[in-house]
C-alpha cells in the first residue's frame, strides 16, 4: 500500500508523456525559426557552439529526410539551453518586422490618397497632422506621379512621393489616413 502511494506521488511529480512531447515539439519549432534566421541574427543570440553548428548545418541541407533529422537534433540540443530568452528575442524580431510592414502600408495608403481624386482633403489632413510638411512639394510630386502613370513612364515621382512621406511621417505612428482628425 505504501509503495502504491510512493509510485503515485512520483507519477504526479513527473510530467506526462504527452506534455513532454508537446514541449519537445515547441523546442523543435524554435529550432526551425533559428534555421530561418540570417547569420547576423544567429550570432546576436549567442547560442552555444554545438547548437550554432547544428543550425548552420541545417541551413546547408537540402534533402528533406536529412533536414528533418537535423531539426530533431536541434530540438534535442535545445533541451539543454534556456529557450525562453531565445523565444523572447525571436518574438521581438517578429514584431518589429510586423511594425515595419504596417508602417510601409500606412505610407502607401497616404501616397494613394494623395494621387486619388481626394488629393486636397488628404493634403489638408497631412498639413494638420504634420505642420512641417512641404505641401506644395507633395502636391507637385503627386501630380507628376499621376501623369507618369497615365503616360506609362517610369515611376520616378511615385517613388519620390513615397520617400518624401517617409521623411514627414514618423515611424512611431500607426494611424490610418483619415483617422484621428476631429
UniProtKB/Swiss-Prot annotation:
Pfam families found in the cross-reference section: DarP
Domain of life: Bacteria
SUPFAM superfamilies given in the database record: PSPTO4464-like
Region (Disordered): 1-25
InterPro entries, sorted: DarP, DarP_sf
Compartment(s): Cytoplasm
Gene Ontology MF annotations: ribosome binding; rRNA binding
Main location (coarse class): cytoplasm
Keywords, comma-separated and alphabetical: Cytoplasm, Ribosome biogenesis, RNA-binding, rRNA-binding
Single Gene Ontology BP annotation: assembly of large subunit precursor of preribosome
One Gene Ontology cellular component annotation held by this UniProt entry: cytosol
Gene3D superfamilies: PSPTO4464-like domains
Its job: Member of a network of 50S ribosomal subunit biogenesis factors which assembles along the 30S-50S interface, preventing incorrect 23S rRNA structures from forming. Promotes peptidyl transferase center (PTC) maturation.
UniProt protein name: Dual-action ribosomal maturation protein DarP
Organism the protein comes from: Nitrosospira multiformis (strain ATCC 25196 / NCIMB 11849 / C 71)
Organism lineage: Bacteria, Pseudomonadati, Pseudomonadota, Betaproteobacteria, Nitrosomonadales
Amino acid at each position: 500500500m505504501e509503495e502504491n502511494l510512493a509510485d503515485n506521488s512520483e507519477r504526479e511529480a513527473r510530467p506526462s508523456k504527452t506534455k513532454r512531447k508537446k514541449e519537445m515539439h515547441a523546442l523543435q519549432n524554435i529550432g526551425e525559426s533559428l534555421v530561418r534566421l540570417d547569420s547576423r541574427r544567429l550570432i546576436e543570440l549567442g547560442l552555444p557552439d554545438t547548437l550554432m553548428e547544428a543550425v548552420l548545418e541545417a541551413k546547408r541541407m537540402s534533402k528533406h529526410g536529412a533536414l528533418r533529422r537535423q531539426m530533431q537534433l536541434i530540438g534535442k540540443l535545445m533541451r539543454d539551453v534556456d529557450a525562453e530568452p531565445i523565444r523572447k528575442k525571436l518574438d521581438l524580431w517578429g514584431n518589429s518586422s510586423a511594425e515595419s510592414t504596417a508602417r510601409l502600408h500606412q505610407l502607401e495608403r497616404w501616397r494613394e490618397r494623395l494621387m486619388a481624386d481626394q488629393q486636397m482633403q488628404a493634403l489638408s489632413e497631412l498639413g494638420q497632422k504634420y505642420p512641417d510638411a512641404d505641401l506644395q512639394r507633395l502636391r507637385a510630386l503627386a501630380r507628376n506621379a499621376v501623369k507618369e502613370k497615365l503616360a506609362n513612364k517610369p515611376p520616378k515621382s511615385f517613388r519620390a512621393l513615397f520617400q518624401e512621406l517617409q521623411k514627414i511621417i514618423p515611424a512611431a505612428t500607426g494611424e490610418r489616413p483619415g483617422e484621428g482628425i476631429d
